[in-house]
């Protein structure tokens, strides 16, 4: 009986690891394998790594795909490096905007009456019930020259001529912030709602103002939620390509769009895989910092 219980416990614990192995580790290894291969000929998108044509098998690793990312043979390859810089910049700005907007909302959500809390949570999750592309297309209609926002501002007399808002940095940031805002609010709310309010009462009894209590108690105690929300926003925002393509300008080339073009337009699977591997490595850095800060907070 005890042995079957232990084996069943191991099976349940092992399921998440098996899921991660099948859907994360194995695809990453496939991606890594393609990234060190040459371009294929004919219908094959990439060449094999092992040459079986001779008696002595040869392992053919092509690291030129990684070299081409950072060097074009003359100097630094500005196309790919600029795409990485642009992706990191807009992902960081999106994360900052989501934090600035999401923290007050999550704070209000955690402190409001329990009777209205489910309705507010439903409003946060409501966008997930509609198509991602439809939501972005709706923003195109709002931000267009003859769109809802320009017509409203003209009617109010705020502006005299339509403003150019679509296909700009601002429109792209609006779209990305709108899409990823729930990913910031939900972990912040989950963290703030569990906070012991007696700590704030004790701070007030000791003479602390509401602002001092917020910065000295609430914010430090919600650090785990802040970091979790930032990671949930930053990581997918780095590889975003749909929103920049539909709302951003031609100069806003992010790495997700570059990978798409290399894969489907140029049919250069090895180069696209190498770009993806480098992007994963860049994302692993803040992820490692997240787990390090989490361990420090728990200690």
Which residues are covered by each model-predicted region?
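Transmembrane alpha-helices
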Residues: 15, 126, 178, 184-198, ...
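Transmembrane alpha-helix signature in integral membrane proteins
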Residues: 75-108
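Glycine-rich helix-loop "coupling/hinge" segments at transmembrane-helix boundaries
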Residues: 241-269
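Short membrane-interfacial helix/loop motifs at transmembrane-helix boundaries
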Residues: 26-78, 143-147, 249-250, 299
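Membrane-interfacial helix termini and adjacent extracytoplasmic/periplasmic loops
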Residues: 54, 136-177, 211, 247-251
